[in-house]
Amino acid sequence: MKNSLRTIRWLPYVTLLWFFGCCGLLLPSLISAESTPRILLINSDASVTKYKESQEAFKQVITQPIVEVDLGDKKWESSTIEDLLYDEDPDIIYCIGTKAYLLANKYVPKKNIVFSSIINWLRLPITDKTYGVSNELHAGMEMTLFRLIFPNVQKIGVLYSKKYTEEWFKNAQNQAKEMGVEIIGQAITNKKQNVSALKKLLPTVNAFWLISDPELLSTKEDLLTILQECAAEKTPVFSYHETFAELGATFTVSVDDPTIGRQAAGIVTGVLSGDKLDNKVQFPAGTYTVLNLKKVKEYGLQYNEGALDTINRIIQ
């Protein structure tokens, strides 16, 4: 009888121990579930090679689960994206391409958003929670590569707009001086001025640097017009997109897309860790170069043959 009473007295304590034991087992998983960040990746179109490469490189770095959305898939309409953004309630969103970014910014502008693969990001609506990797390289890096291949180029012409690229132009001018290069600029207010500005600029320079500026380029026709004007003067064109070399540009320095994805992953990791990022929008770290050797020979340009092995692709 005494043993039975003793057992009854201990029952409440045993029950409490069992309860806390269960809580102890469940607590780590609950904490883990709460602490795992919710990451959403929106790709404007995963069938585009450069977008896909950035996405794959991003996923190789990020170890946490990622919810992926391909806007190239017809099932994703604006309304379904809106529902997903609210349902998932992500801690951070990685947007590849302009379409992805604009959707995220439209529906959840107060969320942390990291972008990449967007030409001329300065034209986009941004918030204090916007981060990204620019699609435009550091001007000093580009000029270093220009001079490596064409060491005799001393004067480079640039068309720019006061609205989007005036600050970039001033910085590029200062960096060029340190390399012994003079950058001569012509400001425009809209693309209708392209031809007249080029006709004034080209006779004074050794090469033309075609930069990313929405006032300058908004259609393929704008690009072709500029390339044709430069070709008529046999002025080599340096630019920022590899496909331009196929259309007549002499030398292009573009971003390396897998590196872009890894950089974006680094930004995402930093933001989720609460790190203070000095540069919210970073310059790309990697490059991909194309030399149109056919144009070089057509124009009779002097070039550094010893540096050809540094070029990623040569058009013969």
Segments (PLM) and residue ranges:
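Intrinsically disordered, low-complexity serine/threonine-rich segments
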Residues: 22-23, 32
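N-terminal secretory signal peptides that target proteins for export/translocation
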Residues: 1-10
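Short hydrophobic alpha-helices and adjacent helix-cap/hinge residues
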Residues: 33-316
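Residue-level detector of bioactive/disordered segments in secreted/extracellular proteins
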Residues: 24-25, 97
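Sec-dependent N-terminal signal peptides
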Residues: 9-22
